[in-house]
């Protein structure tokens, strides 16, 4: 079957760590497994990687179709050919979070120490633990930098944690409908949901796996409560109003009468068939514990952040309000972080980031299109001292397979550049020193220049690369057409 603007059939992969994972609580999780999917092609420079982080009950299946699917991955409106997370340009990775039940190790999996499901023997995990597990996956895939990390809701928390825990890895970050910490109201909603599960007689202290039962009633109620927080009053009015379900007058009893009641019951019932109750307990607890401030100011907590960031709130989201997200924006700006802020106009509430493809497409595409040199450049480059002789330059080019080398002075400032053509000229003119043949008016760029500007400069001067310099004219890297071709060529 062909799916327009879709990836077609995809499959989930699994990575079992060879080492144990140290958790924030001090506990150890023995060689966990990470479920993940990838879309698109990794370029030679490995500079086009985007990590997508899912929300509370999501999974690694973010886009495309699995055999037998009735609908595609949960963010198929955003990921795929020609979409904001364009698989013709980017290599997309999405992994299931630690503690879930969708392929990554969680409480429903077998504890190697007992050969029984973990249940409540599974250790408490945090958002940072999820991020550390994702980092282990990237290490396994030999990926050292992320062009971007993107996520909404709990996925947005992971995005923010990435920029703090691994600031040198992340070039761009997109945080949608999320927060820097869980509010008392959010914790309260989670507490009531967990209580509904724990009070279900079939929960059995978390050991229901061995009993062949499941706390479906408690999990269903928990999902119903959560779903209310994902919607807005406006969307409920538009979708349901006060319309009755399969009747035209009140029954004056305690049966299901309103359409909105029936809808919530359906959401709760179907959810119990595809999610584990203990995983729900652990993941909502991870939400509660999330707090980047850790007894300091938000501004101070965000000091490590180096990436360019897009913060996106939703006008009708009362779970993660725009005030909460604007607090993050102000703290980042106080730290001189390059931050963009957009408000998604929608009546769909918190879940709008999974629905509003039009606005989402524009905002995300616009942000990612403003890539800078530092997003794709090589941070290691060969240089040659200006006192070196022509033979040294020729040997360096030949041994390292380079066609041009920046020339630097004693202070490592760039003073020229020598190319393979210059070496040919040296032979023809019988030149004796690099100073005789090097180009002294060197074309350069900075790490903050836009890629569009660099591309124009390369085309105008018919060159394939530029040295990247800092404010003191010291060479800090290089950028070539190979670095950027996968982002700008179809």
From Swiss-Prot:
A Pfam family: CBS
Subunit structure: Homodimer.
Entry similarity comment: Belongs to the AB hydrolase superfamily. MetX family.
Domain (AB hydrolase-1): residue spans on this chain: 48-354
Residues of the active site: 153, 317, 350
Name of the featured protein: Homoserine O-acetyltransferase
Pathways per UniProt: Amino-acid biosynthesis; L-methionine biosynthesis via de novo pathway; O-acetyl-L-homoserine from L-homoserine: step 1/1
HAMAP family linked to this entry: MetX_acyltransf
NCBIfam families, per the entry: homoserO_Ac_trn, PRK00175.1
SMART domains: CBS (SM00116)
Catalytic reaction equation(s): L-homoserine + acetyl-CoA = O-acetyl-L-homoserine + CoA
Gene designation: metXA
Annotated compartments: Cytoplasm
GO CC, alphabetical: cytoplasm
Record: residues binding substrate: 223, 351
Residue intervals of the CBS domain: 377-434, 438-490
Keywords tagged on the record: Acyltransferase, Amino-acid biosynthesis, CBS domain, Cytoplasm, Methionine biosynthesis, Repeat, Transferase
């Amino acid at each position: 079957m062909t799916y327009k603007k879709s990836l077609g059939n995809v499959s989930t992969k699994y990575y079992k760590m060879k080492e144990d994972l140290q958790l924030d609580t001090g506990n150890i999780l023995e060689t966990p497994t990470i479920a993940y999917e990838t879309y698109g092609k990794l370029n030679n420079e490995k500079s086009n990687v985007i990590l997508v982080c899912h929300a509370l009950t999501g999974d690694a299946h973010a886009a495309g179709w699995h055999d037998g699917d009735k609908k595609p991955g949960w963010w198929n409106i955003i990921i795929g050919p020609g979409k904001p997370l364009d698989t013709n340009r980017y290599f997309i990775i999405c992994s299931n979070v630690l503690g879930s039940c969708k392929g990554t190790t969680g409480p429903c999996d077998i504890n190697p120490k007992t050969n029984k499901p973990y249940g409540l023997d599974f250790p408490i995990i945090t958002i940072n633990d999820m991020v550390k597990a994702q980092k282990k996956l990237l290490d396994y895939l030999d990926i050292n930098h992320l062009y971007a990390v993107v996520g909404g809701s709990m996925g947005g928390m992971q995005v923010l944690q990435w920029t703090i825990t691994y600031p040198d890895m992340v070039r761009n970050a997109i945080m949608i409908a999320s927060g820097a910490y869980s509010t008392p109201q959010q914790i309260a909603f989670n507490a009531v949901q967990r209580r509904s599960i724990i009070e279900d007689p079939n929960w059995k202290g978390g050991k229901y796996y061995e009993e062949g039962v499941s706390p479906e009633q408690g999990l269903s109620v928990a999902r119903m409560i959560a779903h209310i927080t994902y919607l807005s009053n406006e969307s409920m009015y538009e979708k349901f109003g006060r319309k009755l379900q399969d009747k035209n007058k009140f029954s004056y009893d305690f049966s299901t009468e309103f359409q909105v009641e029936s809808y919530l019951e359906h959401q709760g019932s179907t959810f119990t068939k595809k999610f584990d109750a203990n995983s729900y307990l652990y993941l909502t607890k991870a939400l509660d514990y999330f707090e980047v401030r850790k007894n300091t100011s938000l501004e101070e907590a965000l000091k490590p952040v180096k990436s360019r960031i897009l913060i996106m709130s939703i006008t009708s989201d009362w779970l993660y309000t725009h005030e909460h997200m604007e607090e993050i924006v102000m703290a980042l700006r106080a730290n001189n972080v390059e931050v963009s802020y957009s408000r998604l106009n929608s009546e769909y509430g918190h879940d709008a980031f999974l629905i509003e493809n039009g606005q989402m497409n524009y905002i995300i595409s616009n942000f990612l299109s403003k890539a800078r040199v530092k997003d794709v450049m090589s941070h290691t480059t060969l240089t040659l001292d200006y006192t070196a002789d022509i033979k040294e330059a020729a040997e360096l080019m030949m041994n390292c397979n380079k066609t041009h080398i920046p020339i630097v002075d004693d202070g490592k400032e760039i003073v020229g550049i020598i190319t393979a053509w210059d070496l040919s000229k040296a032979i023809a003119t019988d030149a004796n020193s690099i100073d005789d043949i090097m180009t002294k008016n060197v074309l350069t760029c900075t790490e903050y220049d836009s890629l569009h500007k660099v591309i124009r400069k390369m085309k105008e001067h018919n060159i394939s690369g530029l040295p990247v310099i800092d404010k003191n004219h010291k060479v800090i890297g290089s950028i070539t057409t190979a670095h950027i071709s996968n982002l700008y060529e179809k």
